From Swiss-Prot:
Disulfide bonds listed in the record: 199-487
Gene3D superfamilies registered for this protein in UniProt: 3.20.70.20
Keyword Lipid metabolism belongs to the record: no
Protein name: Vitamin B12-dependent ribonucleotide reductase
Free-text cofactor note: 5'-deoxyadenosylcobalamine (coenzyme B12).
Gene name tied to this protein: nrdJ
InterPro entries: RdRp_reductase_class-2, RNR_2_N, RNR_lg_C, RNR_NrdJ/NrdZ, TSCPD_dom, YebC-like
Active site: 474, 476, 478
GO BP of this protein: DNA biosynthetic process
SUPFAM superfamilies: PFL-like glycyl radical enzymes (SSF51998), YebC-like (SSF75625)
Length: 1254
């Protein structure tokens, strides 16, 4: 083949006109800990910090790269393509630590990728001469550096490591078909033939243990997950529940095996340690177990709700039952007899009313009877990574139902539908098609699964129908082909071809890229190895490719075209038609030189029919299609905003058909539209795949850490395209992003602040904090100005300042309306709705997938997403990965209508995601106001007898008094001589010393942390962190707040723990420290790996009648560290005048003494004798429930105006993420709440991780 140079010059480096810079790549956890850091990284100057971080963190090879290399001469290969190996002689001259290094330059990565492709292309005979090979090598490197295109992640991981660095290792059970002999060969090297494929479809037969069967599939899936790829399978061949087995007996059914596969996938994070397994499960709609399958995730979500709610109800009532026993003033066993203990009787009735099992109630009473004062009952939450979700099944795959047209027509006519046995083919059940359709609609509405595969349409466009039907897809549903095949992907960045100045899309440049990258992907098939024999053979036989694009949403906005418009859809259709037409034309050209794919001859008639149908759509024909059940949406020739795109598209398809009829095709498929998650970040795409944008204001990462707000770069370009003046554009931008200053702010500005008592110095402080503030309240708080200033200068009392949810601006007299107006001016509206100068008819140009900002109301409709997909689908070999976002108030009928429209517009697949359909996702608004909870409390109070009402009201009065005491308290100084304990341990190979200091009553008041032989910086940070925690404890911050914030944080050092009797593994130093403190001071044995007390109600006991011993524990607690004894004093002996008594630390009061209700703090009971002592015990129980707005104020500002994060809770971080336009879920790799929906998957904007395979 001849290769044209379009971007490079013969004899010049492809990087000659590209500036490069050095940067530091760093990714941090939300708590500030470093996940990854690499210095002196060389990247193109125009690359963003996020693109640089993703390249450095994910795609740089960090091990085994020899510092000295030498070329291996090959006679038949041009010298510039000779591969390299380590130069052992030169390496021996270097210090041992310097011999093997990491890749540090983007040029190294571009060179190894393009060099490897060109090397194999040369050996495969793809180039006419040396000059063509050199041009191919140079053009590819230029395109990669300019972010014009990117291959899928496995190419970045694996391709060129053997060619560029001589990295090698023994085979891992992979296979390839030798391109020169055509023979299936087992790989002897793990690297010589790279594994560049991201997407796999695997078959599974109705066989338990043999090759190709059920258990074999889990092994094959594990091999793919390990290397970072995704896989999908159709399980419809598996027998339904109750079907006969060949050896006698009955089948356990489809679902039993799907649950095994789900557990296996959940145990393996895709890529070994990087992300969850990417997996697709498909079941045909006529399978006997289809109803159970459709309801699978719905019922599992219900189980999560039951676990969460039930655990809270059980804990509440069981603790109340135990408390009624412990606080009883009766004698002997009377306290444990509900007939003699009215309080116990009442609590048992309440527990039964809440359906707490009688057996458990009885168990707790027996537990109390043995002398125990508290019970540990785990409470679950709806967090995606919580124990509740880990307990249920069905959470590790995308589930789809495969529908044929006869089912959908039965839905339209209200016909019957038969479910058929797998073996006998007999009808096992007949039901109404609409009833099953209703189940599908409800399940999608309630749990976001199943998605749908429109199987008839998929197979109508199938190029190789003679070789079998398409039955499944990869996890993201863009690759659809025969079982046991694979596809390697690459995506073009459409925006790089658009010239903003000339308002013209470079069609020729786009065609040039499509041609070259068809060759790249074809060469990748030739050089690849595969995880099984079948996949190796069929991938060689059909040679499927997956070229696609990204940034269509960014391109449309830049051009000033609404995503939901005829022009936008026509442009999308034309660009897609050009791409696939050129790829098939190129495939035919390769076939003329190297021959067709081996399966072509058998399928020539089917393939040419499909190509003719593609061509008809490109020529705008509405009918005349061959053998299609549903006609596609043809190219809109009139509405396309750039006429030459239409003519190029039609010419490409004319040539593709003409050359194909003459030479055949090298590839059975050539294009898909993938979600482009991680690779979209490497290309700095505003939008991924075919998606619109998700927000107009983005948070751009800085090289030194932190973020700053910027307008989406497409917005000013769109405004210029729409004819706005630069001054108007500047004002619209400032409206969206904010002015970052008090200057000219309405309501709140320098003059109004001075009138309220603010000094010039205070105003200067807040001005410094405002440019990076997400909300004005983040800057106007006590951490910016200091409590002394607010109290002394502004005259606000200490009690008000310390109150939860304290709002300084409201406290000094500003109204909510004034605050909101100032907030929009200073911090930005995060939307252009309501912006000055912007005409209402231009609003649709800036519509996103979700409403933007706090005041944004507009977002793209469900139908607009589906119609955009329909505009592209007729020109795609495979399908489109996309999830349709639906608002929270969407109905089941809306879901069914969306699916029905998708079928009628000839889509091959679709999936829906209704906002709030997962329990783990936070709602955008509160269901009912807090005061309605108070109404419920009043109603329940009136239901009780007068004595109980009096007791409850009195308790509330005490509670308020206690709370007031707590709120008003100043710093509680530690005693000069204090007790505590020192714990030495080794965490992940690093020595850690934890020392505690306690108040006289045993409460924790300070901690010291030291790390043995660590660097000065880390030791200093850890020491100062301990001081900060100690100050918080002394000012009344409950220990459980720290425990909740810092347990389960992840950063190095981490790993096994030695030297601690309770903690055996920690995910970080902070995780270890706060687990230890929680176990020792809060009796949080759920955070321990070994229970130090074994004080469960089924334990053997201590050998004494614990409930009848004298109360001596409160004396002993003043003499011994509560932490050292793990909050237990039952093993202490108090000597008094020669007599011995067993001290029961938390026992009941002696008979005859006054009894005050004990106020327990997180499992550590405390006998309280008066209100003040009650306040001390109760302070850790005070729950500062914040509103969503208050939760956002977790960001605190230091006196310098710099943001200081006190690690807000997950709920707080979710709320902020939702406000910024993210999904509100946490990235499982870096812990940041920056996930955006990406096709059927999710993508992290911080670290680049995806839940899919690109």
């Amino acid at each position: 083949m001849r290769i044209e140079r379009r971007h490079t010059t013969t004899g010049q480096s492809p990087y000659a006109g590209i500036d490069f810079r050095l940067t530091t790549s760093e990714i941090r956890n939300p708590d500030g800990s470093v996940v990854f850091k690499l210095d002196n990284v060389e990247v193109p100057t125009e690359w963003s910090q996020v693109a640089s971080d993703v390249l450095a963190q994910k795609y740089f090879r960090k091990a085994g790269v020899a510092a000295r290399l030498k070329k291996v001469e090959e006679e038949s290969v041009p010298s510039f393509l000779w591969r390299s190996v380590p130069d052992t002689e030169a390496l021996s001259q270097l210090p041992e630590k310097e011999r093997y290094v990491s890749e540090l330059s983007a040029k190294q990565v571009f060179d190894r990728l393009a060099g490897c492709w060109t090397y194999w292309g040369w050996k495969g005979g793809y180039f006419t001469n040396d000059e063509d090979a050199q041009a191919f090598y140079d053009e590819l490197r230029y395109m990669l550096a300019m972010q014009m295109v990117a291959p899928n992640s496995p190419q970045w991981f694996n391709t060129g490591l053997h060619w560029a660095y001589g990295i090698d290792g023994p085979g891992q059970g992979h296979y390839y078909v030798d391109p020169f002999t055509g023979k299936l060969t087992k790989s002897k090297s793990a690297y010589e033939h790279p594994q560049p494929h991201a997407c796999f479809i695997q078959g599974v037969g109705d066989d338990l243990v043999n090759e190709g069967g059920i258990m074999d599939l889990w092994v094959r899936e594990a091999r793919l997950f390990k290397y970072g790829s995704g896989t999908g399978s159709n399980f419809s061949r598996l027998r339904g529940e109750g079907e006969k087995l060949s050896g006698g007996g009955r089948s356990s059914g489809l679902m039993s095996f799907l649950k095994i596969g789900d557990r296996a996938a959940g145990a393996i994070k895709s890529g070994g340690t990087t992300r969850r397994a990417a997996k697709m499960v498909v079941v045909d709609v006529d399978h006997p177990d289809i109803e159970t399958y459709i309801d699978w995730k719905v019922k599992e979500e219900q189980k999560v709700a039951a676990l969460v709610t039930g655990s809270k109800i059980n804990q509440k009532h069981l603790k109340a039952v135990l408390k009624a026993c412990v606080n009883c003033e009766g004698s002997g066993d009377d306290c444990f007899d509900p007939e003699k203990n009215p309080a116990l009787r009442r609590e048992i009735k309440l527990a039964r009313r809440s359906l707490v099992p009688d057996n458990y109630i009885k168990r707790v009473i027996q537990f109390a009877k043995q002398g125990y004062k508290d019970i540990q009952f785990d409470v679950y939450d709806t967090d995606w990574d919580s124990e509740a979700y880990l307990t249920v099944s069905g959470q590790n795959s995308n589930n789809s139902v495969s529908l044929k047209d006869d089912f959908l027509r039965a839905v339209e006519t209200d016909g019957d539908w038969n479910l058929n046995a797998r073996t006998s083919k007999k009808v096992t059940k007949t039901l109404k098609a609409r009833d099953l359709w209703e189940k599908i609609g409800y399940a999608a509405w309630a749990s976001a699964d199943p998605g749908l595969h429109f199987n008839t349409t998929m197979n109508d466009w199938h190029t190789c129908k003679a070789s079998g039907d398409i039955r499944a897809s990869n996890p993201c549903s863009e690759y659809m082909f025969l079982d046991d095949t694979a596809c390697n992907l690459a995506s073009a960045n459409l925006l790089t071809f658009y010239n903003v100045a000339t308002k013209h899309f470079d069609v020729e440049g786009y065609e040039h890229l499509c041609r070259l990258w068809t060759v790249v992907l074809e060469i990748s098939v030739m050089m690849a190895q595969f995880p099984s024999k079948a996949i190796a053979e069929l991938s060689y036989e059909f040679r499927t490719l997956g070229l696609g694009y990204a940034n269509i949403g960014g391109l449309l906005m830049t051009m000033g075209l609404p995503y939901d418009s005829k022009e936008g859809r026509a442009l999308c259709g034309a660009l897609t038609a050009v791409m696939t037409g050129i790829t098939y034309k190129t495939s035919a050209e390769i076939a003329a030189e190297l021959g067709t794919f081996p399966g072509y001859k058998k399928n020539a008639a089917h393939m040419l029919r499909v190509i003719r149908n593609h061509r008809r759509a490109a020529h705008g024909q509405s009918n005349g299609y061959e053998a299609l059940s549903v006609n596609p949406v043809p190219l809109d020739l009139v509405s396309c905003p750039q006429a030459d795109l239409v003519s190029h598209a039609q010419a490409a398809w004319d040539a593709a058909l003409e050359l194909g009829e003459k030479h055949g095709y090298r590839n059975a498929q050539t294009t898909v539209i993938a979600p482009t998650g991680t690779i979209g970040l490497v290309m700095d795409c505003d939008t991924t795949g075919i998606e619109p944008d998700f927000a107009l204001v983005k948070f751009k990462k800085l090289a030194g850490g932190g973020y700053f707000k910027i307008i989406n770069r497409a917005v000013p370009a769109a405004l210029r395209a729409l004819g706005y003046r630069e001054s108007e554009i500047a004002e619209i931008e400032a409206y969206a992003v904010g002015h970052g200053s008090l200057s000219n702010a309405p309501g709140i500005n320098a003059s109004t602040l001075k009138a309220k008592g603010f000094t010039d110095e205070a105003i200067a402080k807040v001005e410094k904090a405002l440019p990076t503030a997400f909300d004005i309240k983040f800057a106007f708080n006590k951490w910016t100005f200091g409590e002394d200033f607010i109290r002394d200068q502004l005259g606000i009392g200490a009690e008000a300042i310390a109150a939860p949810g304290f709002d300084l601006l409201q406290a000094v007299g500003f109204t909510k309306r004034e605050i909101e107006a100032a907030n929009v001016h200073i911090c930005g509206a995060m939307t252009v709705e309501g912006a000055p100068h912007l005409k209402a008819e231009h609003y649709p140009v800036f519509d996103c997938a979700n409403p933007c900002g706090k005041i944004g109301k507009r977002y793209l409709s469900v139908e607009s997403h589906i119609r955009m997909m329909a505009a592209a689908q007729p020109f795609i070999s495979g399908a489109i990965s996309k999830t349709i976002n639906m608002p929270n108030d969407a109905t089941v009928e809306d879901c069914k209508s969306a699916y029905m429209l998708s079928w009628k517009l000839a889509l091959k697949a679709n999936a829906l995601y209704r906002d709030g359909s997962k329990l783990s996702q936070p709602l955008n608004s509160q269901l009912i106001a807090d005061d309605e909870d108070e109404d419920d409390a009043v109603e329940s109070l009136y239901e009780k007898p007068m004595a109980a009402r009096t007791a409850q009201v009195s308790e509330k009065i005490v509670e308020k008094l206690v709370e007031r005491i707590i709120v008003m308290r100043e710093r509680e100084k530690m005693p000069d001589r204090r007790k505590g304990y020192t714990q030495k341990a080794v965490v992940g190979g690093h020595k850690v010393y934890l020392r505690t200091g306690e108040y006289d009553d045993g409460r924790l008041g300070e901690i010291f942390i030291d790390m043995h032989k660590e660097g000065a910086a880390l030791r200093s940070f850890i020491n100062n962190f301990a001081i900060a925690v100690s100050l918080g404890l002394q000012y009344g911050v409950p220990l459980d707040e720290y425990v909740d914030a810092f347990t389960f944080t992840r950063f190095e050092p981490a790993g096994p723990v030695q030297g601690n009797d309770s903690i055996k593994y920690a995910t970080s130093i902070l995780d270890y420290v706060f687990r230890e403190l929680a176990v020792s001071y809060m009796s949080r044995f759920d955070l321990a790996h070994v229970d130090p007390t074994e004080s469960n109600f089924d334990a053997l006991g201590k050998g004494v009648e614990e409930g009848k011993e004298p109360d001596e524990g409160h004396h002993a607690s003043k003499l011994v560290s509560r932490g050292l004894t793990r909050s237990r004093t039952d093993n202490l002996v108090v000597m008094r005048g020669g007599s011995t008594a067993v001290a029961q630390g938390n026992d009941s009061a002696p008979s005859g003494g006054s009894k005050v209700t004990a106020l327990a703090s997180h499992g550590a009971s405390a006998r309280v004798g008066d209100v003040l002592e009650g306040a001390v015990a109760l302070k850790q129980e005070v729950s500062h429930d914040l509103s969503p707005t208050e939760k956002l104020e977790a960001l605190q500002w230091s006196k310098s105006g710099t943001a200081q994060t006190l690690v807000p809770s997950k709920a707080e971080r979710r709320a902020e993420a939702k406000a910024k336009g993210y999904e509100g879920e946490m990235c499982s790799e870096c812990g940041n709440f920056t996930l955006v929906r990406n096709g059927t998957c999710m993508k992290c904007d911080t670290c680049g991780s995806t839940t899919g395979c690109s």
